Amino acid sequence: MFRQLIAVLVVALCVGAGTMTAQSQSQTAADTFIWHGELVSVDQATGTFTVKARMLADAAKEVARFKASDKVVLTWSGVDRYGDAIRQIAKHDPTQKMTDPFAFPVELASPDVQNEYVTFKFRAPNAVGSVKSVKPGEWVTVTTKKGSANDVQAVVSVEPYNKPASNT
């Protein structure tokens, strides 16, 4: 009887642990969104990425209000987990809670918008190694926490847009 009870408890724990893991992974996916940009540069020492991304025409007009190195909040147009183009740019106020899930703070690298692309910087020290094969001018896929107010933690990952095929 005691062995049966132990066996039932072990099975219950295994099933429960598997369910918890699946919930954690899906919750993480639901709390992030992905967007694509052109890699300009990576400062390996600081983990700072400089990227160009597309802006909607109305948002592009607003960039002239800012100067290089200003902290701004970019808000992406998007649905579910996918950001398309930047739809809004605003001054970053670290005391204000971000309510839009597709917004995160960055540093404006240049107030010049060329062909509806804006250049900005963000920190993602843990992602530097994953883009060693990416050259400036190539595209990256960036996963960002929804509504993150902390620029160090906003970006979850940066990966090559075209991942090399694995040999498995």
Please name every model-derived segment.
Residues 2-7, 12-168:
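Short, flexible, surface-exposed loop segments at domain boundaries
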